[in-house]
Amino acid sequence: MIELFMKQKMFSFKDAFHIYDRDEQETFKVEGRFFSLGDSLQMTDSSGKTLVSIEQKLMSLLPRYEISIGGKTVCEVTKKVTFSKPKFVISGLNWEIDGDLWRDEFQLTDGENVRMSVSKKWLSWGDSYHLQIAYEEDVLICTAIAIVLDMVLYNDEDESIF
């Protein structure tokens, strides 16, 4: 089980997240671009090498984001139309989101196995979240999906769930 802590940078003109390991060492940094049409973020390692790209697809009625690792599209995350709690489709992976997104407690599953659990850390400066990722090979994609969910649900309200 890989444990990461995700903190959204406060007071920034662009989207920015810092991801730390259990020893409080920064593992990844995620930053958006200034003046881009739609959201466009890059996840980098400690040396500044881009590992993941997150691009909002603007030619869509509903929020839709493409996640690429190493230049290859891995999945798309699209918000579905609902009248109650938010729902998302994660195409390309056949994964599902279970739990309560509004209460900041949910799991990402592949139908049988939990791939990631997310919970909000209360009483912290800014928005901080605890990510528990079951498989090492899922660290990048799970972290990117958590960031996309935050952007879709709370970007317009200047709030965050991750």
Swiss-Prot record:
Under InterPro entries, the record lists: LOR (IPR007612), LOR_sf (IPR038595), Tubby-like_C (IPR025659)
UniProt signal peptide: none
This one is known as Uncharacterized protein YxjI
Report the sequence similarity comment from the record. Answer: Belongs to the LOR family.
**Highest taxon of source:** Bacteria
One Pfam family name is LOR
User: From which organism does this entry originate?
Assistant: Bacillus subtilis (strain 168)
